[in-house]
Amino acid sequence: MFVYLRGTVVGHQSEGGHRCALILEVNGVGYRLLVTSHLLQQYPPRPEVVQIFTHLSIREDQMLLYGFASAAERDLFLRLIRVNGVGPQMALSLLDTLPLPELVQAIVSGNTRRLSRAPGVGHKTAERIALELKAALSAWRQEMGFTTASSGLPSEAVREELELTLLALGYSDREIAAALTAVGQTTTLPNNSDPEAWLREAIAWLSANT
């Protein structure tokens, strides 16, 4: 029904269970959109006009409008909620935990450990998501122009150690994923190099960009 809405953000709402809502005023009408906390941070209340992609969910007892930063993010959300046992809130939780290309990569590679970091996503659900979406997303990400994992990224063993260390230092999964991707694109370190060397570069990037 609605592909996107264009208007001004006039307010935020935070609810229990990691639920976040954004109030978007369009031609004098305020729309309440359920969004990720990341999108909430991206669009603070201010007079500039923004465009948010939407999905309208109609149930017997309610109508809910979901908001997304891009058409690709909305498309992945719709694919996720078609998986048995994955509802809209869990899909938003997955989108909030990892940047879109990283989330797609985790699904395609069957990395259930990374998927299980999203609040509410257990190991069995993560396995089901990977099993049902792996093939479709492998082709879809190429259509969307997402790059696959770079050979410059750390090996899985090194990455796991880095993620655990950076999580302990207080960084979020989304920040860690962005840092490792950025470092992997510029570093001369081998992918199986000493984790401490990767850690130094990752922290340097995070200090400059967060």
UniProtKB/Swiss-Prot annotation:
Residues 159-210 are annotated as: Domain III. GO terms for biological process: DNA recombination; DNA repair. The keyword Repeat does not apply. Residues 149-159 are annotated as: Flexible linker. Residues 70-148 are annotated as: Domain II. It is found in: Cytoplasm. Residues 1-69 are annotated as: Domain I. GO terms for cellular component: cytoplasm; Holliday junction helicase complex; Holliday junction resolvase complex. InterPro entries: DNA_helicase_Holl-junc_RuvA_I, Hlx-hairpin-Hlx_DNA-bd_motif, NA-bd_OB-fold, RuvA, RuvA_2-like, RuvA_C. Gene3D superfamilies: 5' to 3' exonuclease, C-terminal subdomain (1.10.150.20), Nucleic acid-binding proteins (2.40.50.140). Keywords: Cytoplasm, DNA damage, DNA recombination, DNA repair, DNA-binding. Homotetramer. Forms an RuvA(8)-RuvB(12)-Holliday junction (HJ) complex. HJ DNA is sandwiched between 2 RuvA tetramers; dsDNA enters through RuvA and exits via RuvB. An RuvB hexamer assembles on each DNA strand where it exits the tetramer. Each RuvB hexamer is contacted by two RuvA subunits (via domain III) on 2 adjacent RuvB subunits; this complex drives branch migration. In the full resolvosome a probable DNA-RuvA(4)-RuvB(12)-RuvC(2) complex forms which resolves the HJ. Belongs to the RuvA family. The RuvA-RuvB-RuvC complex processes Holliday junction (HJ) DNA during genetic recombination and DNA repair, while the RuvA-RuvB complex plays an important role in the rescue of blocked DNA replication forks via replication fork reversal (RFR). RuvA specifically binds to HJ cruciform DNA, conferring on it an open structure. The RuvB hexamer acts as an ATP-dependent pump, pulling dsDNA into and through the RuvAB complex. HJ branch migration allows RuvC to scan DNA until it finds its consensus sequence, where it cleaves and resolves the cruciform DNA. Has three domains with a flexible linker between the domains II and III and assumes an 'L' shape. Domain III is highly mobile and contacts RuvB. This is Holliday junction branch migration complex subunit RuvA. It comes from Thermosynechococcus vestitus (strain NIES-2133 / IAM M-273 / BP-1).
